[in-house]
Structures are given as structure tokens and as C-alpha cells.
Regions:
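The feature captures the beta-strand-to-loop junction immediately N-terminal to the Walker
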Residues: 41-43
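Helix-to-loop junction immediately C-terminal to a conserved catalytic motif
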Residues: 56
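Conserved ABC transporter NBD signature motif
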Residues: 64-72
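Conserved ABC ATPase "signature" region
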Residues: 120-138
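Conserved ABC ATPase signature
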Residues: 142-146, 150
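Conserved catalytic motifs of ABC-family nucleotide-binding domains
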Residues: 163
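Catalytic Walker B motif of ABC-type/P-loop ATPase nucleotide-binding domains
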Residues: 167-171
Length: 334
């Protein structure tokens, strides 16, 4: 597998006014590969943004090296780096009435002459970038008139206009609703695969990262940085350990976080399909430990359907009560 970017015993952090060094993380050895979507995840304050800025060449490392192909990243001229690495930051860009097309055209700056004139070839790249992200119809609209999801697509198009081998995005879904978050993640996954690009993004959306990433970089507070398949890091307990917090736990079986509640004891649940899934979630929210398909529990919920209608039976040692809605079940057991 080819490598487009690699770190070698990298140390990241800051030098404050007195030139004293504040190391955030050290001994980092990671790689990025063409065609892969890599997600960097971890709690706030772990150093994700510092790592992203260092890998993008925006911040010098405290020690070690970042190599871009065979070259050391931080020794290359900025114009040369810009032809290989494109960055989309979290900060909202305020550009007045600049059109989406004009913003994307700024991505051609590393290729234009000193007057910034666009050749026909540059114009074609800009149009193609907008088309690729599904934003061609937004070209003439001012950026200030776009929704957050539309704006993010345009920002990604601007990065694509640089024709980079590597795309680095700092929390690209931070201000988006759920459908737009899914849309942007699917877009980035496609851009990596079909464009043979290495894409690295940081995110707090663990569920989407687990579903969409080819590889995870897991950065807990204090390190170390761990790399692996999403499923592998879930199975070996690294995800649960990294996000361990009082009152919250990561459920390896469901691949999601669960809020720890005062226990109500075990409860049996039998049934299939969506009704069983959402009934289990409602019971767990109340604090029950749900045991599937068990006949030995003192309290059981049996789900049955007939003629398209769902019925819930709450079975106790001396009673069997039928309910027509999940609301009634939860009110009875709550």
C-alpha cells in the first residue's frame, strides 16, 4: 500500500512567550494512504486540532518529521505544499458577497500567475470541483446566502480545486444537522475512493466515523495515538477506554454510547424487527437490563403483530397485560 504522508517520531505542541515548550503529544508514527478515509477521534483537549495543523504544515513540529512523499513537509515552499495538501477548517469563513464560484476559484491560486488570472484549464477545474460535490447549481449565489450544508460543500469544492493528493478537514460536520452530516461523510468517502485521495478528518460524531471510516486514529487525553480499523478498535476495547466517562459507557455490541442509569433489574424481551429494537432502547433508557428471548425473567415483554398492528404483552408472575402502544408499556413499567 502506497503512502502519501507519514510522520516519524513526531512531537506536537507549542512554544509559549518564554520559549518554553508545551508538548501535547509525542512519538507519533502514522501514515495516510490514497483511497482511504481516515477519521481522527478523541475527547476535547486531546490535541486533535494541533495534530491536524501540524500535518497540514500550518504549525511546526516540536520534534520529529512529517514527510510528504519523499520530501519533508515543513521544508517545502508553501506553494508546493498547497498543490499537494488542501485544508478545510472549522472556522466559518466570512467573505461578504463573494460568490460560491469565486470562492472555489481561490483554490487555483497555487497554479495562477502573479496577477491571479485563471486560464481556461483553471476554469474547467473550478467547474468540475463544484460538479463533483453536487454544488454546480450554487455557483452564482453569494456565500452568505447558502445554508450550512451548502457552504460546507463549497468549501470542500474549494479544496478540490487545488487538485490535492491529501485533503485535511477539521470537524467538517460540526454545524450540520443529521441528514447533512451523513451527506457530507458519504461525499468524503466517495471522494477518497473514486479520486484516489487520502482524506483525514477530525470528528466528534463517533457513530458516523465507525460506519464510514476506512481507518481510525484514536487519540485519548494524554495519548498515545492508536491506529486501526473501526471495528478492531471497538472489539479490543480501545474505544471504550478512550471515551470512558462517569455515567457514560461505550456498548461494544451496539457500537454506541449508553448512559448509565440506576438499575431497575433484568427484563426479558422477545420479538423481532423495528418494534423490538425500539422497545429495547426504551427499556434501557428506564434502567432495565434487557435480556433477549429469555423465558426465565420474572418480568417479560413479548411483542406480537397481527394484520399490521403491534401488541405488547407485559408478563409478570401473576398477570399478562396487553398494550397497544409502547407509550403505555413504558408508563406501566416506569
Amino acid at each position: 500500500m502506497s503512502t502519501v504522508l507519514a510522520t516519524h517520531q513526531l512531537a506536537i505542541g507549542y512554544k509559549n512567550a518564554g520559549q518554553a515548550t508545551a508538548t501535547v503529544l509525542d512519538r507519533i508514527d502514522v501514515t495516510l494512504h490514497p483511497g482511504e478515509l481516515t477519521c481522527l477521534i478523541g475527547p476535547n483537549g486531546a490535541g486533535k486540532s494541533t495534530l491536524m495543523r501540524t500535518l497540514a504544515g500550518m504549525q511546526a513540529p516540536l520534534a520529529g518529521r512529517v514527510t510528504l512523499g519523499k520530501d519533508e513537509l515543513h521544508r517545502l515552499p508553501p506553494a508546493q505544499v498547497a498543490k499537494q495538501v488542501a485544508v478545510v477548517l472549522t472556522e466559518r469563513v466570512e467573505v461578504g458577497n463573494l460568490s460560491a464560484y469565486a470562492l472555489v476559484a481561490l483554490g487555483r491560486h497555487p497554479y495562477t500567475d502573479w496577477r491571479g488570472r485563471l486560464r481556461e484549464q483553471d476554469e474547467q477545474v473550478v467547474r468540475q470541483a463544484l460538479q463533483t460535490v453536487g454544488a454546480a447549481h450554487l455557483a452564482a449565489r453569494p456565500l452568505s446566502h447558502l445554508s450550512d450544508g451548502e457552504r460546507q460543500k463549497v468549501m470542500i469544492a474549494r479544496a478540490l480545486a487545488q487538485e490535492p493528493a491529501i485533503l485535511i478537514l477539521d470537524e467538517p460536520t460540526a454545524f450540520l444537522d443529521l441528514p447533512r452530516r451523513v451527506e457530507i461523510m458519504q461525499l468524503l468517502h466517495t471522494l477518497a475512493r473514486e479520486g484516489n485521495r487520502a482524506i483525514l478528518l477530525s470528528t466528534h460524531d463517533l457513530d458516523l466515523a465507525l460506519r464510514m471510516a476506512d481507518r481510525l486514529w484514536l487519540l485519548p487525553t494524554g495519548g498515545p495515538l492508536t491506529v486501526g480499523l473501526p471495528e478492531e478498535l471497538a472489539l479490543n476495547g480501545m474505544l471504550a477506554q478512550a471515551f470512558q466517562s462517569e455515567g457514560v459507557e461505550f456498548d461494544n455490541e451496539q457500537g454506541a454510547f449508553k448512559v448509565q442509569r440506576s438499575p431497575c433489574g433484568p427484563i426479558g424481551l422477545s420479538g423481532h424487527g423495528a418494534a423490538a429494537l425500539w422497545t429495547a432502547r426504551a427499556l434501557e433508557r428506564l434502567g432495565y437490563e434487557v435480556v433477549r428471548d429469555s423465558q426465565s425473567m420474572p418480568v417479560q415483554v413479548h411483542i406480537a403483530g397481527s394484520n399490521g398492528s403491534t401488541r405488547w404483552h407485559v408478563i409478570k408472575p401473576n398477570s399478562d397485560t396487553e398494550y397497544k402502544s409502547l407509550t403505555d408499556v413504558i408508563q406501566h413499567l416506569g
